[in-house]
């Protein structure tokens, strides 16, 4: 679990703090330093062969891809729990 950090543009990558949950439309190679800091990753797009899923597996971090609208529902500071095995994101406490 961790606090949400929305990454809506590249400039947001510098805002992520260690232990936050990176939430983005998708990830790309330049997201990897931020992904290393994150406790987990959630993306709107993608699947088991997406960049986010592959890098998350390599880093041993929980990841849920293909949520369709996580970036619209979640807000910076929300406390969430990720179950990467089942593909479930639970909002524990809103901002």
Model-derived segments and spans:
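Acidic, glycine-rich flexible loop/linker segments
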Residues: 4-11, 15, 19-20, 25-27, ...
């Amino acid at each position: 679990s961790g606090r949400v950090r929305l990454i809506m543009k590249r400039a947001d990558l510098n805002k992520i703090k260690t232990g936050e949950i990176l939430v983005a439309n998708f990830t790309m190679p330049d997201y990897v330093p931020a992904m290393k800091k994150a406790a987990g990753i959630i993306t709107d797009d993608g699947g088991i062969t997406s960049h986010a899923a592959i890098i998350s597996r390599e880093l041993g971090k929980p990841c849920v891809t293909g949520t369709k609208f996580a970036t619209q529902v979640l807000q910076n500071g929300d406390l969430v729990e990720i179950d990467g095995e089942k593909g479930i994101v639970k909002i524990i406490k809103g901002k």
